[in-house]
Amino acid sequence: MKNRLYDATKIDWDNLMFSTKELWMLLIPIMVEQMLNSLMGMADTMMVSNVGSVAMSAVSLVDSINTLVIQVFAALATGAAIICSHYLGKGDEKGANKAARQIFLTVIVISLTITAGGLIFCRPLLRLIFGAVEPAVMENSIIYFLITASSYPFIALFNAGGAFYRAGGNSKFPMKISIISNVLNIIGNAVLIFGCNMGVAGAAISTLVSRAFCAIVVLYFLRKPKQKIVLNQYLTIRPDFPLIGKVLAIGIPAGVENGMFQFGKLAIQSTVSTLGTQAIAAQAMTVIFENVNGIAAIAVGIGLMTVAGQAFGAGRKEEAKYYIIKLTGYAEIVLIISCAVTFLISRPIMHLAGMEAESMELCYQMLIAITIAKPILWALSFIPPYGLRAAGDVKFSMITATCTMWFCRVALAVYLIRFQGFGPIAVWIGMFADWGIRSIIFSIRFLSGKWMEKHVI
């Protein structure tokens, strides 16, 4: 089996780039950071849910757009992590620092452009996507979107800065920033939502402040000289278009993949919005639980980009394949545990969130299906692609993910809801089909070895 998956004879087992201990030291802080990032969205939704289903639905709908935008920034961070990891793997810290400066410039320009567009076209955008929702939900959505859109540059800069630290093997520092940020967010929610009765506006302002804190802190500490990647003298940065092109060669396909994924979710969300406020609220909470039970496994994938990227940069292709297999196994283990734990705590959390009985029962039924299907299908469909991206095979991942998203997940969900009378469970039936087909396609791609013919730098 090892010879089929990787050539063990070409790996220097006495001089591995990452030991098992070092892998977990990299992965655990990323898991904590990702959990805290998810908790920020969960805190908004749960605390707003006590104001009522209208407010909860507004936050859920707008966060589906916010997630789309954040995924664009995550794609740029993916490019940052892979490019910088390759440079560091080959021992070229000067090249890594030069790339980091260009990534910073690119992130600033793109995030400010998206923010300006969001603020200008807020109302027509929301009416286009969620025109069928109740007027009260729409008004709350507009308020929440205008404020959270102002935080886009901050979250973009923090994502890029965190990617620089992780590329250098330091995943603890971004985690520490996230811990403080989430404490600020929860305190802000409590004060503004309940103390000042500001509803969705309070949740949005709290999110804005906490994201601004993250960006300011990470940019300040990137100026310190005693680390692998140093970023300072921001005003002296000038565009290096060939280098920006290398970053975008990774970032654009990853961004298109993430963007199409989120557009698909918006299409599904638009369909679910026709089922009424109870179904929207149930789906919103189910999405939160599904995000939570996959956080640890996603963190493994994020860590894999650094690990495989450095291995490829050092020219150790078989060792990179070994890490992809090993970390896919890690992801499966943490996925089984997190799905079980999330399911066990789901009912108390739904009660704590003040969900209405009908929404709660719908949510619980969907969560049962997710807890069974996700450990079987998810890991092979998502973790190996992180390794393929680290090798520069981003276009194949983009095409595959886009096709399975639209032709399986979206098409099946829309068909079942609009033509077969299904409720929100149709969303998850489509998702399970998507995961299953992805896992087959990416397994075949990995075994073919064609993905290792790509070049990053």
Residue map of PLM features:
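Helix-terminus/linker motif at the lipid-water interface of multi-pass membrane proteins
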Residues: 35, 39-57, 126-135, 191-198, ...
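Small-residue-rich hydrophobic transmembrane alpha-helices
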Residues: 56-116, 155-174, 280-346, 378-401
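Short runs within selected transmembrane alpha-helices of multi-pass transporters and secretion channels
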Residues: 77, 147-166, 174-182, 203-218, ...
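Transmembrane helical elements of multi-pass membrane transporters/channels
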Residues: 25-44, 147, 181, 210-214, ...
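N-terminal transmembrane alpha-helices
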Residues: 14-46, 50-51, 67-79, 83, ...
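Short alpha-helical transmembrane segments in multi-pass integral membrane proteins
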Residues: 1-27, 84-151, 195-252, 308-374, ...
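Transmembrane alpha-helix boundary and packing residues in multipass membrane permease domains
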Residues: 30, 34, 45-46, 82, ...
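Interfacial/gating helices of multi-pass transporter permease domains
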Residues: 25, 48-67, 135-140, 200-201, ...
